[in-house]
């Protein structure tokens, strides 16, 4: 995949600034590039047993050794004392009441693990919820259209978790993903606007474990970041994945000038109202504070 975009990285201190790399003219400018190791068409299965409910009713904390956290605070961090930007006044705007409200997947249905890693997306007619290793599809009135189903029943790769669901409104398609413990990102893109129908399923192998993946929709691809060192930002060929093309690629690069407190995950910008013009760079956001980095 040949991208000629300017890769821009935005990092937040107390103010926001943008760091732009030179225009990339070929794949050789990126540290990682690979074609999907597997592509197939799959149909969701909603009549298989879900994860067993915890007999003791307890919630379990899932420890992830891949997540690197340093709980250190710098004595030289500014400002000293209170935050001068802290707002002490209540908003004058009244809160809006929910349009509709219903119970989704609960802890027992989703395996009882903590954190639950919830993700949800809404489309014109559906709401898709993912929690831990389970997902379920509802209509927009809150009626369950399917039984809860394991991620593995659709995505394969076991039920590793860290699920993400997006509705790509520009293509009227659904995007569901989880990682696998084989250093893979597994992505399903629906073939129609119906999330209960068939999906194009892609498996992308990476150089190391893609912890805490975060995705976005952009004009030239699906962008994704991961909590890992080395190549930690990627772009998937969106057009090919929507078409079910088995030659779809993912390219990756290392985010430059990133000082972290041990947590590498960055948030990619996603298009909301309209798709940016072709050639518009994507922006990656990272909150950086001198108290820890």
Predicted regions and their residues:
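Bacterial Sec-dependent N-terminal signal peptides
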Residues: 1-25
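C-terminal PAP-associated
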Residues: 22-293
């Amino acid at each position: 995949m040949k991208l000629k975009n300017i890769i821009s990285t935005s990092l937040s201190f107390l103010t926001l600034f943008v760091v732009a790399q030179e225009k990339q003219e070929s794949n050789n400018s990126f540290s990682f590039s690979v074609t999907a190791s597997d592509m197939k068409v799959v149909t969701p299965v909603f009549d298989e047993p879900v994860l067993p409910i915890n007999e003791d009713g307890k919630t379990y904390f899932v420890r992830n050794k891949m997540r690197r956290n340093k709980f250190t605070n710098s004595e030289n961090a500014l400002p000293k004392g209170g935050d001068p930007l802290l707002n002490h006044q209540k908003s004058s705007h009244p809160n809006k009441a929910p349009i509709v409200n219903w119970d989704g997947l609960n802890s027992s249905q989703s395996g009882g693990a903590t954190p639950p890693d919830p993700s949800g997306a809404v489309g014109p007619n559906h709401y898709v919820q993912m929690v831990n290793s389970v997902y379920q599809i509802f209509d927009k009135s809150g009626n369950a259209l399917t039984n809860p189903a394991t991620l593995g029943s659709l995505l394969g790769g076991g039920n590793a978790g860290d699920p993400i669901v997006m509705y790509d409104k520009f293509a009227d398609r659904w995007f569901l993903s989880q990682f696998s413990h084989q250093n893979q990102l597994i992505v399903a893109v629906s073939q129609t606007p119906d999330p209960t129908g068939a999906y194009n399923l892609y498996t992308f192998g990476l150089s190391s474990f893609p912890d805490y993946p975060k995705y976005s929709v952009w004009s030239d691809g699906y962008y994704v970041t991961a909590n890992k060192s080395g190549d930690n930002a990627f772009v998937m060929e969106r057009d090919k994945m929507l078409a079910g093309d088995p030659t779809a690629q993912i390219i990756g690069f290392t985010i430059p000038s990133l000082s972290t407190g041990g947590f590498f995950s960055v948030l990619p910008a996603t298009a909301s109202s309209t798709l940016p013009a072709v050639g518009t760079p994507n922006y990656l956001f990272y909150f950086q504070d001198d108290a820890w980095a």
